[in-house]
Design a protein with these regions (language model features):
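Membrane-interface alpha helices of multi-pass inner-membrane proteins
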Residues: 215, 260-276, 282-287
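Membrane-interface transmembrane helices that cradle and orient dolichyl/undecaprenyl
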Residues: 245-260
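Transmembrane-helix signature of polytopic, membrane-embedded enzymes
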Residues: 31-37, 179-182, 199-221
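Transmembrane-helix motifs of polytopic, lipid-linked glycan transferases
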Residues: 74-86, 183-206
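Short acidic/glycine- and proline-prone juxtamembrane loop motifs at membrane-interface regions
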Residues: 230-237
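Membrane-embedded, hydrophobic transmembrane alpha-helices
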Residues: 1-94
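Extracytoplasmic catalytic/substrate-binding loops of multi-pass membrane glycan-assembly enzymes
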Residues: 123-137, 143-168, 178-179, 328-330
């Protein structure tokens, strides 16, 4: 029952995400609709965590924010559906012609969901980083009240990590009324399903239904995917956001819809809000979008991208400057920058990479 309530607690944020996506990207064909649906979790959870963080940073109670959010999200999705009746229509699939592929997809999705559930039951607290970082911070936020910032007194294991995952779990616990392990399990199970769904919908929109089924079934069949999805870390979330940003970037080259740049900028900004490793992704995507703007000879592309990026990135900058302690990796003796100039490190990487590729070639 608590697991079901955890899923219900996540739904308003998914509704909020869909509302935002559809407001920016008004394509109404079935293939685009699937992409919107499976992007909704990332956008919705991201917006919620950003606003929730700013709310509690201002000294306001998280409980009040959580209830305002659910009311607003439900009202917005009701208004959206009432104004866009075509959204009620499901994407058309020739069931008779595609019955075999649909069965293959359904069976794969069923086994994937069962694997995720069994992993969650086996490791209800996640794996080590979840115990000592992500879920601990969420407990400080939920249980700490006005003293939630004492979480930054922790001086072990990246105390400067941003708050996408902790805020999302803390808001879920507000609805559950306790720090139940089912809250994080539901979040990461939902994210794992949405990653697979987004992968399917992107292949479907760029290729076709059969190739999408084949690709996603192979994807979810890897034990690595289940493991990463349910460890309760932020790595899989970061991969999901980068996948969404990359997929929409490719879509822009086909549709020429510059407004998608707003979503790309927002998604890649959320990547940095999810984990420090998302910061290099911002640099990479920013350079890519500058290149696209030059190629298409329009600065509207980069303008839309930067507008989408500004809210999550500015929030992250404020968090890093005024709240987060110094990064434990960057503050070690000697610093990180001098190590970047040690050519022996690059030689070791090249040697190991060559050895790995050589072995793969021999096995073929």
């Amino acid at each position: 029952m608590t697991l079901l309530l955890s899923f219900i607690a996540l739904l308003p944020r998914i509704f909020l995400g869909f509302f935002i996506i559809h407001s920016v990207w008004n394509a109404k064909d079935g293939k685009s609709l699937l992409v919107k649906i499976f992007l909704s979790a990332g956008v919705g959870f991201g917006v919620s965590s950003l606003l929730g963080f700013l709310w509690i940073w201002g000294g306001l109670p998280l409980t009040v924010y959580a209830w305002i959010e659910i009311i607003v999200a439900i009202l917005l999705i009701i208004w959206l559906l009432s104004q866009n009746r075509e959204l009620w229509r499901m994407p058309q699939i020739a069931v008779k012609q595609e019955f075999l592929w649909l069965s293959f997809l359904a069976l794969g999705a069923l086994f994937f969901a069962l694997n995720l559930i069994f992993y969650g039951l086996q490791y209800p607290h996640g794996r080590p980083d979840a115990w000592i970082n992500w879920n601990v911070v969420a407990r400080f936020i939920y249980l700490g009240g006005t003293d939630w910032q004492t979480t930054f007194l922790r001086q072990w294991d990246h105390p400067d990590y941003p708050l996408f995952v902790p805020m999302t779990n803390a808001i879920t616990w507000v609805f559950l009324g306790s720090t139940s392990t089912w809250g994080p399990i539901a979040l990461h199970l939902m994210l794992s399903l949405f990653v697979a769904g987004l992968f399917f919908s992107l292949v479907n929109i760029f290729r076709d239904f059969k190739q999408a089924v084949l690709a996603v079934v192979f994807f979810i069949a890897f034990p690595f995917i289940t493991n990463q999805g349910m460890r309760q870390y932020a790595d899989f979330l970061l991969a999901y956001l980068i996948l969404g940003a990359g997929g929409l970037t490719l879509l822009i080259t086909q549709t020429k819809d510059n407004r998608l740049g707003l979503l790309v900028g927002f998604l890649i900004g959320l990547g940095a809000w999810a984990k420090n490793e998302g910061l290099p992704a911002i640099l990479g995507f920013s350079l890519l979008w500058v290149g696209l703007s030059f190629q298409q000879k329009t600065w509207k592309l980069i303008q839309h991208y930067l507008v989408g990026l500004v809210f999550p990135f500015l929030t992250l900058v404020l968090f890093k400057i005024f709240l987060a302690p110094s990064n434990d990796l960057m503050s070690v003796a000697g610093g990180a920058f001098p190590k970047l100039l040690e050519w022996e490190r690059y030689l070791t990487i090249l040697q190991m990479g060559w050895s790995l590729l050589w072995e793969l070639g021999r096995r073929r």
